[in-house]
Amino acid sequence: MMLTSPDVLTVTLPLALVDAEPVVRSALQAEQFGVITEVDFQLRFREKLGIDSPPNKTLGACNPRLAAEVIAANADAALALPCNIVLREEDGSTVVAALRPTAALGRFGPSVAPLAARAEASLARVFAHLRDAITTDS
């Protein structure tokens, strides 16, 4: 299922999640994002619920300098950090998606808006890099 919300950045990589994840991590690192959290939903659902599900991970990506500026501008904005990058395997490909930082941080006031725009520009470059790395995208 492809996401169509204007508040979501998305790209489909023609790779299984296990192969797409290092590509995504590399693209994030190139834009100064580190992965500070990781949730493997497939593993958690299997362990906790006995449910088999397709591969699905969320990577919590953070640019520490930018995050520090956001929190300094409005401490409550930490509620929207880090940027969650979702990797979801569908039909042998991996959908990579993220909520636009301007959408996630927009409710925290005008002092955060320019920082959200900077974060979004950086994250958009990550997704552009991922699109450039493949021959087909969605």
Predicted ranges, named:
Residues 5-7, 55, 81, 92:
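A generic structural signal for well-ordered coil/turn residues at beta-strand boundaries
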Residues 15, 19, 40, 114, ...:
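Conserved active-site and cofactor/substrate-binding residues in soluble primary-metabolism enzymes
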Residues 34-86:
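Compact, glycine-rich, soluble single-domain proteins
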Residues 79-92, 130-136:
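Short secondary-structure transition/capping segments
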Residues 104-138:
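Well-ordered alpha/beta subsegment
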